[in-house]
Amino acid sequence: MQFDWSAIWPAIPLLIEGAKMTLWISVLGLAGGLVIGLLAGFARTFGGWIANHVALVFIEVIRGTPIVVQVMFIYFALPMAFNDLRIDPFTAAVVTIMINSGAYIAEITRGAVLSIHKGFREAGLALGLSRWETIRYVILPLALRRMLPPLGNQWIISIKDTSLFIVIGVAELTRQGQEIIAGNFRALEIWSAVAVFYLIITLVLSFILRRLERRMKIL
């Protein structure tokens, strides 16, 4: 089959819309995942027995199941279990990214906190700060700097994971590509264009994250 460039140009506006949806889902999902991950990570590191084990169960369940199963459970199974619950595809996608990324960010948080030398914690306590003030004003700022590279990697993973939400009909980049192919039957050209879009997004994001890392001078 000969590659037909003319099949790509009419598809670009729809692919751009799909790329916007992909980014929007990943940004909202990762923002929520950061909150979940920080809470679960601190529960694992500083929490009591109950908080530690609740966070551990959450992390192991989410990391031990495929993201496709998670989104199918949220979108199809939960409304069947709760008759009054209605979840649209976009909400299901965002919530899935939140929960999925949150489990991984929890371990990123835990690793970053544990990597901070205990001398910083001792110094905070010696200055009269309480345990939680030391965590908030001393440990957390240092840990966040060390978390930046793996968080950036998690964002890129989440962007690519959105392609799996084609199973619930979210109009993200992969879904838009599929819809275009259903109309023009040019799979080679359209999937090539979709791949280029993903590559552009991840390369730009990687470049921005590298610049941020250099500016923050990771400790």
From Swiss-Prot:
Positions in the Cytoplasmic compartment: 44-53, 110-150, 209-219
Record key words, sorted: Amino-acid transport, Cell inner membrane, Cell membrane, Membrane, Transmembrane, Transmembrane helix, Transport
Keyword tRNA processing annotated: no
Periplasmic side: 1-22, 75-88, 172-187
Alphabetical GO biological process terms: amino acid transport; glutamine transport; L-glutamine import across plasma membrane
GO cellular component, one term: plasma membrane
Name of the protein this chain belongs to: Glutamine transport system permease protein GlnP
Species: Escherichia coli (strain K12)
Organismal lineage: Bacteria, Pseudomonadati, Pseudomonadota, Gammaproteobacteria, Enterobacterales
Gene it is expressed from: glnP
